[in-house]
Amino acid sequence: RIRYKGIVCDRCGVEVTRAKVRRERMGHIELKAPVSHIWYFKGIPSRMGLTLDMSPRALEEVIYFAAYVVIDPKDTPLEPKSLLTEREYREKLQEYGHGSFVAKMGAEAIQDLLKRVDLAAEIAELKEELKSASGQKRIKAVRRLDVLDAFNKSGNKPEWMVLNILPVIPPDLRPMVQLDGGRFAASDLNDLYRRVINRNNRLARLLELNAPGIIVQNEKRMLQEAVDALIDNGRRGRPITGPGSRPLKSLSHMLKGKQGRFRQNLLGKRVDFSGRSVIAVGPTLKMYQCGVPREMAIELFKPFVMREIVAKEYAGNVKAAKRMVERGDERIWDILEEVIKEHPVLLNRAPTLHRLGIQAFEPVLIDGNLLRLHPLVCEAGNADFDGQMAIHVPLSEEAQAEARLLMLAAEHILNPKDGKPVVTPSQDMVLGNYYLTMEDAGREGEGMIFKDKDEAVMAYRNGYAHLHSRVGIAVDSMPNKPWKDSQRHKIMVTTVGKILFNDIMPEDLPYLQEPNNANLTEGTPDKYFLEPGQDIQEVIDGLDINVPFKKKNLGNIIAETFKRFRTTETSAFLDRLKDLGYYHSTLAGLTVGIADIPVIDNKAEIIDAAHHRVEEINKAFRRGLMTDDDRYVAVTTTWREAKEALEKRLIETQDPKNPFVMMMDSGARGNISNFSQLAGMRGLMAAPNGRIMELPILSNFREGLSVLEMFFSTHSARKGMTDTALKTADSGYLTRRLVDVAQDVIIREDDCGTDRGLLIRAITDGKEVTETLEVRLQGRYTRKSVKHPETGEVLIGADQLITEDMARKIVDAGVEEVTIRSVFTCATRHGVCRHCYGINLATGDAVEVGEAVGTIAAQSIGEPGTQLTMRTFHTGGVASNTDITQGLPRIQEIFEARNPKGEAVITEVKGNVVEIEEDASTRTKKVYVQGKTGMGEYVVPFTARMKVEVGDEVNRGAALTEGSIQPKRLLEVRDTLSVETYLLAEVQK
């Protein structure tokens, strides 16, 4: 078969064969002196050291020719494996005579020692020792036993840790590339191998010449160092550097870390049948569709198209079919249309922070070079239309089925982290629906009565009725809505816009007249219906003007729709909501100009008053009535209050029809702080060190900033930019570690049958409730039955799933704590069971066996990590000595159970705070807690802010001051469960 077998090129003497051998054939270097392998000598723990029972320090001295080691003492009183310096060695030789004992240096000596290790005997001896040993000795024995046992079982010999022959990797893995300009760029490995060869050859020549011992020794040491650098450059001593003092990349570096062989090329390959392009919005797409450019699709689906061409006999064989595709034959486009039907593709938005970052869509062919993305899917992958996305084609039937069943975008309506809709409309869609549902008094057509929707729309289109005017409509024209019997056959007061808005709602939802949950869950309020013979204008005049539907109202409607009708109906409804929003946002034609930014009438007064107050504070400080710290706090508080006063005035005087106000109020874009910087004042800025500067920026953007004010603004702007860049990496690393520990937590079985549970109540922080009991109960299983606290009636039995309605019922009955099944107490081995986990938040149903809940949890914590600010030190204006860590660093602190910065003082006694006395001489406060068993006395720093007052009742482990509790201290005072609960509460903050 092989044509060139055995032929050698007559010009360069190289065998003629496949080019592939340059990746397969290895060479080797025969070393003229044994060399130790740095991994086994320097790795932690040192395998060589453990095998020989020598310290790494001693090994290093021997291997690098700084000391002799006794290999065989023969009849002399020397200890085997003891070290001798050059001088001691000479003295001992003179003392005992030449040949009376054997001592060597270098890797050769280590090799001899390793050959002498009797594995079986050593293992037996260690097992004996383990029976009696304790403490450090025991740990060391266990470690040694591990290594020796491994040698014994694998059949590898210990002396093989020292190399006599050094393998050389194939040339294609350490290539030389010719650059344009005739120069060559070579892999660093070539330099490292070259050093080894040069030193090895020099050593061979010295040995031939019988050179003096000291020179040979030096050359052997250099050879050892050259091999070390080749295997792991920089592990010992200073790394060998190339041009520009750059450390050379050794074999270990080729494998290590994110850029190494494993993570870069083996786990993270680039794949065929993928592409990437800039994304643009596709408002006409359905929720499960995406637009793919023709040129891209033909390349991605090429093999499928070629198969069809041959099947349709347009071409005789695959080669001809390929040529046909490459020529761009007219007939291929129809075939492409057929091929992509029912064949989903995956779209990925980098960085993929959670599982919603990759979703499946059905491709729709479009012209141009852009990928088109459905606007509602943006929120999930945090996509905006200024970047690129990648597209992948699932090839096998199984992959296609998985994409269609598990990953289709229309299925992913709820966020797996909290079960809230992740596909809420944003920006224009919100604005359009907001404008559509506005109400206005006295607009044209007010008080008209229509027989049905079509008549109302006709009146609006022809200019007889305004979108916002309040009109009547016959209830019977919407027979499928869930009206109360008393409401049927009547006339209802609503607006033309709301008629259109309700037209797209699922039929079983009530007619939405007010943007609140009562209307959504219980039906339209009775006050909007006319009694027979009533005058419509009177009813209209008696009604208040409703606020329009905002972003969060739309979110609630979507959640309710999903709860009642599940995925298919919800995704169809979302598309209708999107179209309606875009349409009316366009019709409304909202624009903003500089004149739309309002002017606050009393701004000058507010600012003068603040200046006056600051002057008074400074006077008091100069008289010695307050400390500098107090003055700083007072000044910054004054300016903060001034800014808030302006904000308040802004909200009071704003015109609800102002485009800025509409955008802000609807939740489409911007918030009150943006608005107050445009119209109020910019306020206080942070200096580069994070401390808030006392000089506020008095101007707003409408008036324009002075040069100095502009300069102050740049501090925080720059800090913001750098923080964003730095925190992304930190957050990514945290996610990686979380996934690493949680990935094998999977739902393994239906019920673990544990009798333990977790007693939960609302999570509070001080006096404020951070998470209500109702929210915590939803979707969990009860551990014990829950009884009504007054009547004793059983509200729900043991081991039952608590639905949303049930949770509300339990809380309404006045129950304050419930024992539920929890993953903390689950008894399943290697995972958790369905009952302890509860519902799968992404679907709203009980979780399936096999769901990878650990990874979902890790991603749910990691994904918002990027949004958490890096505001490490955030003090309430007070430059106190207890800086409390916040944001991402705080999350890391919790997961690693570090001792927190700004630690809170906790009480070990359960009881009442009886007094808090201040001691000015030591600058501390003392807190006394009286319990049943005795009095607890706690010393806290003078500047710490107290969380308790005299007379408060405290439990064991409660924090007396603001700050973070150290988990280890809490564990000493309470039990594991309360530590788990505390950590849970902290992460949820």
Swiss-Prot record:
MF terms (GO), sorted A to Z: DNA binding; DNA-directed RNA polymerase activity; metal ion binding
Gene Ontology cellular-component terms listed: DNA-directed RNA polymerase complex
UniProt keyword annotation of Amino-acid biosynthesis present: no
Cross-referenced SUPFAM superfamilies: beta and beta-prime subunits of DNA dependent RNA-polymerase
One Pfam family per UniProt: RNA_pol_Rpb1_3
Enzyme nomenclature, EC number: 2.7.7.6
Positions annotated to bind Zn(2+): C752, C826, C833, C836
Cofactor dependence: Zn(2+)
Protein family per UniProt: Belongs to the RNA polymerase beta' chain family.
Binding partners and assembly: The RNAP catalytic core consists of 2 alpha, 1 beta, 1 beta' and 1 omega subunit. When a sigma factor is associated with the core the holoenzyme is formed, which can initiate transcription.
Name of this protein: DNA-directed RNA polymerase subunit beta'
Taxonomic source organism: Streptococcus pyogenes
Gene designation: rpoC
